[in-house]
A protein has these predicted regions:
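A conserved beta-strand element that flanks and buttresses the S-adenosyl-L-methionine
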Residues: 111
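Short catalytic micro-motifs in class I SAM-dependent methyltransferases
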Residues: 114-118
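Class I (Rossmann-like) S-adenosyl-L-methionine-dependent methyltransferase catalytic domain
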Residues: 1-105, 119-126, 130-201
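Conserved active-site beta-strand-loop modules that form the wall/rim of enzyme catalytic pockets
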Residues: 108
């Protein structure tokens, strides 16, 4: 299957979320998978002695991480940020974009899961610069890459109308302000933490 790496992103309406989140046969992820992801993030941050009191989920979708983080980090306040007017009306999320969202204060943990591939190069770069401003300590980033499309994802369940880039495109930009702890979790360079040599990626 050929894919145009510059195809425009779809509208994030009810039809989109019905296909990729609400229909079992076509959904891209499950609550159980997202719970494992939240548990992994929480474990890495606990191991690194990074306290989390405020979480920003930038591109929170239907909020699968909200309940999961409530279980793994019960003292943390969760804020869901979403561009979709449909989801903001349904779930009462904060409407906005990771490209230019500017809250009064940064969050201890920012999550940006499967968002950046929907942005063109200019907006994706702006979003990554803004993520550093939004993040007080830790950032979790996941984005569908060219390698993922070719070798890892289930294409029948994965939206291909995205901007597929090499993973290094993201990593180069993240490394300007963050150190990678592993499994998509990044720590701001100006945050004090003991990172054992062999545990760093």
């Amino acid at each position: 299957m050929r894919i145009d790496f510059k195809r425009p992103a779809p509208g994030f309406d009810s039809a989109y979320f019905r296909k990729y989140y609400f229909t079992a046969a076509t959904r891209v992820t499950t609550a159980a998978e997202m719970r494992r992801r939240a548990d992994l993030i929480a474990a890495i941050l606990r191991h690194s002695s990074i306290p989390v009191r405020r979480i920003l989920d930038a591109g929170c979708g239907i909020g699968l991480l909200r309940r999961a983080f409530a279980e793994s980090m019960p003292r943390a306040r969760y804020v869901g940020l979403e561009t979709s007017a449909y989801l903001c009306k349904r779930y009462h999320w904060t409407q906005g974009s990771v490209v230019d969202f500017a809250p009064r204060a940064p969050s201890d943990l920012v999550v940006c899961y499967d968002v950046l591939q929907y942005l063109d190069d200019r907006d994706a770069a702006r979003a990554m610069t803004n993520l550093a401003k939004l993040t007080r300590a830790a950032l979790y980033v996941s984005a569908l890459t060219r390698e993922d499309w070719r070798a890892n994802c289930d294409r029948a369940r994965t939206d291909g109308a995205v901007h597929l880039r090499p993973g290094d495109w993201y990593r180069r930009r993240l490394r300007r302000r963050f150190n990678h702890l592993g499994f998509g979790v990044w720590l701001r360079k100006d945050v004090s933490a003991i990172l054992w040599d062999m545990e760093r990626s």
